[in-house]
Swiss-Prot record:
<comment type="subunit">
    <text>The 4 large subunits of the cytochrome b6-f complex are cytochrome b6, subunit IV (17 kDa polypeptide, PetD), cytochrome f and the Rieske protein, while the 4 small subunits are PetG, PetL, PetM and PetN. The complex functions as a dimer.</text>
</comment>
<keyword id="KW-0812">Transmembrane</keyword>
<feature type="transmembrane region" description="Helical">
    <location>
        <begin position="5"/>
        <end position="25"/>
    </location>
</feature>
<dbReference type="Pfam" id="PF02529">
    <property type="entry name" value="PetG"/>
</dbReference>
<keyword id="KW-1133">Transmembrane helix</keyword>
<keyword id="KW-0472">Membrane</keyword>
<keyword id="KW-0249">Electron transport</keyword>
<dbReference type="InterPro" id="IPR003683">
    <property type="entry name" value="Cyt_6/f_cplx_su5"/>
</dbReference>
<dbReference type="GO" id="GO:0015979">
    <property type="term" value="P:photosynthesis"/>
</dbReference>
<dbReference type="GO" id="GO:0045158">
    <property type="term" value="F:electron transporter, transferring electrons within cytochrome b6/f complex of photosystem II activity"/>
</dbReference>
<dbReference type="GO" id="GO:0009512">
    <property type="term" value="C:cytochrome b6f complex"/>
</dbReference>
<dbReference type="InterPro" id="IPR036099">
    <property type="entry name" value="Cyt_6/f_cplx_su5_sf"/>
</dbReference>
<comment type="function">
    <text>Component of the cytochrome b6-f complex, which mediates electron transfer between photosystem II (PSII) and photosystem I (PSI), cyclic electron flow around PSI, and state transitions. PetG is required for either the stability or assembly of the cytochrome b6-f complex.</text>
</comment>
<dbReference type="GO" id="GO:0017004">
    <property type="term" value="P:cytochrome complex assembly"/>
</dbReference>
<comment type="similarity">
    <text>Belongs to the PetG family.</text>
</comment>
<keyword id="KW-0793">Thylakoid</keyword>
<dbReference type="GO" id="GO:0031676">
    <property type="term" value="C:plasma membrane-derived thylakoid membrane"/>
</dbReference>
Length: 38
């Protein structure tokens, strides 16, 4: 049986990790476009 605390931590970290990767990819994509335009 999985501990509720561990399960809560995992469920809490997954959205944060996905959000962090999305923001990082967006910033890199935006930065790349700015460099290409210049």
């Amino acid at each position: 049986m999985i501990e509720p605390l561990l399960l809560g931590i995992v469920l809490g970290l997954i959205p944060i990790t996905l959000a962090g990767l999305f923001v990082a990819a967006y910033l890199q994509y935006k930065r790349g476009n700015q460099l290409n335009l210049e």
